[in-house]
């Protein structure tokens, strides 16, 4: 039987692994050309900044799902959150590896982003499982739109980053649909607007820091 202490310890372990350990993917990184494309310094800097933002998004996804898994009392729903977290863990590994390849660093504020997202996830879980799932749906839909915009902004020659972002976008859509199928309630419009504003702050800051 899983106790509250077990769940709390698992959440703490997940936070430490996300922030300080090298992430490992359970799936192979999306197919890229056998020979890496040479990017100009300008294109490399742009790709690095965009992939840093995407990496921050995956750090936050780990925090959100960990908090919601901790907060729910429904064992089936907890498994749903943990499964999604594992799939998002692939994204975390892919984006971190791509940052390394581009010679770019992760955001220096990752511990802050993680803490904020974990807090939001706990608040969402306290509102009830269906609203918590609604929070997942809206988060994933916003991330999906954000990734679509990155596909438009990434250099055409950066096939590696584009392949990763395209796969991530498809996965986010599946996570949103799965949450809807699990009984998600739609969030009020003001909450959606607040989430967009918070995401805008995060992406703007993470692009640079």
Swiss-Prot record:
Gene Ontology BP terms: ubiquinone biosynthetic process
Sites where the protein binds Fe cation 2: 88, 140, 172, 175
GO cellular component, one term: plasma membrane
Transmembrane segments: none
Main subcellular location: membrane
Gene3D superfamilies: 1.20.1260.10
EC number: 1.14.99.60
Function: Catalyzes the hydroxylation of 2-nonaprenyl-3-methyl-6-methoxy-1,4-benzoquinol during ubiquinone biosynthesis.
Protein name: 3-demethoxyubiquinol 3-hydroxylase
């Amino acid at each position: 039987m899983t106790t509250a202490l077990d769940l709390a310890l698992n959440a703490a372990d997940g936070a430490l692994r996300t922030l300080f350990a090298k992430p490992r993917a359970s799936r192979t990184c999306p197919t890229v050309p056998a020979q890496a494309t040479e990017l100009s310094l300008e294109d490399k800097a742009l790709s690095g900044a965009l992939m840093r933002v995407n990496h921050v998004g995956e750090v936050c996804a780990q925090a959100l799902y960990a908090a919601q898994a901790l907060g729910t009392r429904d064992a089936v729903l907890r498994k749903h959150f943990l499964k999604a977290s594992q799939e998002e863990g692939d994204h975390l590994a892919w984006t971190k590896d791509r940052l390394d390849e581009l010679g770019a660093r992760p955001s220096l504020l990752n511990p802050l982003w993680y803490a904020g997202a974990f807090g939001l996830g706990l608040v969402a879980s306290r509102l009830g499982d269906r609203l918590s799932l609604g929070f997942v749906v809206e988060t994933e839909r916003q991330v999906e739109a954000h990734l679509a915009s990155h596909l438009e902004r990434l250099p055409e020659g950066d096939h590696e980053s584009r392949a990763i972002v395209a796969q991530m976008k498809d996965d986010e859509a599946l996570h949103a649909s799965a949450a809807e199928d699990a009984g998600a309630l739609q969030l009020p419009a003001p909450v959606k607007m607040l989430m967009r504003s918070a995401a805008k702050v995060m992406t703007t800051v993470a692009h640079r820091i």
